[in-house]
């Protein structure tokens, strides 16, 4: 059986279109996109509401989830890095997580494994 990976990327919201364009170039077209909040090196920021300061330490991010066969793993990672970084990259440009994927099942056809991706 061909090995599969589950790629999770956290990126800046304004870089989503660029990441999608890069993924389309390598024919990766099936992905899940979610709006999430979090913080890392950016640490968030202070907000003032009704004369009170609040630590708004959660920043808006985009979470992209993609299941790929091993042959698509490195091109997928490079596409995400290229799109998310832009021309020079910033603190908070994102992170990519790669996890082993044991199985995939397409509910409609009952296909499993790499064919279901």
From Swiss-Prot:
It is found in: Cytoplasm. It comes from the Archaea. ADP binds at residues 32, 40-42, 92-95. SUPFAM superfamilies: GlnB-like (SSF54913). The keyword Magnesium does not apply. InterPro entries: N-reg_PII, N-reg_PII-like_a/b, N-reg_PII/ATP_PRibTrfase_C. Disruption phenotype: Disruption mutant exhibits a partial growth defect under nitrogen limitation when molecular nitrogen is used as the sole nitrogen source. GO terms for biological process: regulation of nitrogen utilization. ATP binds at residues 32, 40-42, 92-95. GO terms for molecular function: ATP binding; enzyme regulator activity. Keywords: ATP-binding, Cytoplasm, Nucleotide-binding. The keyword ATP-binding applies. Induction: Expressed under nitrogen-limiting conditions. PROSITE patterns: PII_GLNB_DOM. Inhibitory effects on GlnA1 are abolished in the presence of the effector 2-oxoglutarate. One of its GO terms (cellular component) is cytosol. SMART domains: P-II. Belongs to the P(II) protein family. Involved in the regulation of nitrogen metabolism. Regulates the activity of its targets by protein-protein interaction in response to the nitrogen status of the cell. Allows finetuning control of the glutamine synthetase GlnA1 under changing nitrogen availabilities via direct protein interaction. Homotrimer. Interacts and forms stable complexes with the glutamine synthetase GlnA1. Unlike the enteric GlnK proteins, Glnk1 is not covalently modified by uridylylation under nitrogen limitation. This is Nitrogen regulatory protein GlnK1. It comes from Methanosarcina mazei (strain ATCC BAA-159 / DSM 3647 / Goe1 / Go1 / JCM 11833 / OCM 88). The gene is glnK1.
């Amino acid at each position: 059986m061909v090995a599969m990976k589950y790629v999770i990327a956290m990126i800046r919201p304004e870089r989503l279109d660029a990441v999608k364009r890069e993924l389309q170039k390598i024919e990766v077209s099936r992905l899940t996109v979610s709006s999430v909040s979090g913080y890392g090196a950016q640490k968030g920021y202070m907000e003032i509401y009704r004369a009170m300061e609040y630590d708004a330490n959660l920043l808006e991010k985009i979470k992209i989830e993609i299941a790929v066969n091993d042959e698509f793993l490195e091109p997928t990672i490079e596409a995400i890095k290229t799109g998310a970084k832009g021309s020079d990259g910033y603190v908070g440009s994102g992170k990519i997580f790669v996890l082993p994927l044991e199985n995939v099942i397409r509910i409609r056809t009952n296909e499993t494994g790499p064919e279901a991706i």
